[in-house]
Amino acid sequence: MKHLRLPVVLAAGTLALTACAGVGNKDAGGGSSSQGSADSTPSGTLNIMGFSGEDEVAQSRITAFKTAYPGVTVKNNKGDFDAQQFLTAVSSGNPPDVVYIPRNLVGTYAAKAAIQPLDDCIKNSGIDTTQYREAALNEVKLKDKTYGIPEFYTVSANLISGKSLAAAGVAVTDIQTTDWDKLEQTAKKLYVAKNGRPARIGYDPKLPDFFPLWAMANGAELVKPGGEPNLNDPKAVEALEFSIKLVNDQGGWANFKTFRDTFDLFGAKNQFTKDQLAAFPIENWYVNVLLDSRSSGLQLQSTPFTDRQGQPISTIGGSAWVVPKGAKNANAACQWAKTMTSLETWHKAAEARMQTVTKDKSFFTGLFTGNKKADEEIKAKYLKPTGDAGFDQAINNYYDVLDKAKSVNPSAAGAEIDAAWKAAVGKALAGSATPKAALDQAQSEAKAAFDKAPQG
């Protein structure tokens, strides 16, 4: 039942991507290399890459497409997106027809001509782009062209072990990100060491992955609206300094990471039930994972992640359907993207999820589709009080931040910018560079990549 939206590792080959050939006219798949029209019926073979498609939310939507278009043979090369595999397929002139990729990579692939604009697909197939959440749609655009059809919408909130807080005499309201000095004191109070090493982390800032969220909380924008990197903004430097201080207060990076790596994040006996962690910010998919932990004594609590003015905020994550240059069945690919993300299909996915919920004798934790109307209607129809106040609060915190969440601006050098800040945070955590020096170097490298990048 666990529908997980996990980060995808960026293969090194992405950064070496060069411009790819244009759209091919030959159609070995028996379909159409054009993006179709509202009255065109796709046929032939649809080759998909990057889509695991194992759970009921995915399977119900695949079934919806196959039912609507029985003339299409769907071939899904199951597995997460692999950049090197994708680039090899594109450069060889034998790309898949549709690819499922993290939205933060769309700008890079669009700028370097590995994927094609979908404006004709959207127009000809009558895709209503107003149904998608604006922040998600923003991530798949470059220079006023749309290169992907978005789906899913991961946002963050603080999840908390009520047991850990009770043992330390800490109130749930003390897990807050508005007052950083108070958060540091709370983390220290919750932190437990044995033999000089962490035995319980008080508050995990989730570095390196959550650096963009901490920067946003401090008012920094890591990528400017035009796509130019802004990694060494003084507010970003301050955010990195603070979040690293939280780590250093709790054993230092080497000990902290070694201990954190022992967490059984997906197990019923995880870091919360084993009292290894008091609190951390994490995405909405994790609430569904924690359902199995209730029988192991989990006492879940939650607070929103806020900026320093006390307003709930979140970065967003999610995926997109893109059509590579040279796709042989772009018409079927377009209809696939439309069908998979439509209001009607999301309702079928929600029905499938509820069947699983009923079978598991569990409860609905939300479905965050990236389709605003679908989110609202599914929530109204299926979200009920769970009987567990902590889970109710967590679910509500995730829903409440949906309209406030912001994407990192798309960039023609999005992959390079992403790699640069991750390397910088790694250096700063390891102590091989100060946060400022690390981000200065990252900015220099990212800016050079941006200046060289084709702008779409």
Region annotations inferred by a language model:
Residues 2-108, 123-130, 309, 344-349, ...:
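Conserved N-terminal structural module of periplasmic/extracytoplasmic solute-binding proteins
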Residues 51-53, 101-105, 154, 282-287, ...:
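Beta->alpha turn/N-cap motifs
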Residues 83, 220-293, 297-305, 438:
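Extracytoplasmic ligand-binding clamshell segments of periplasmic binding protein
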Residues 84-95, 112, 164-165, 184-192, ...:
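Short helices/loops that flank or line small-molecule/ion binding pockets
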Residues 104-156, 182, 299-303:
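Hinge/lid segment of periplasmic solute-binding proteins
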Residues 122-123, 140-210, 220-258, 323-331, ...:
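Helix-loop-helix "hinge/cap" segment bordering the ligand-binding cleft or interdomain interface
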Residues 286-296, 310-315, 323-419:
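C-terminal lobe and pocket-closing loops
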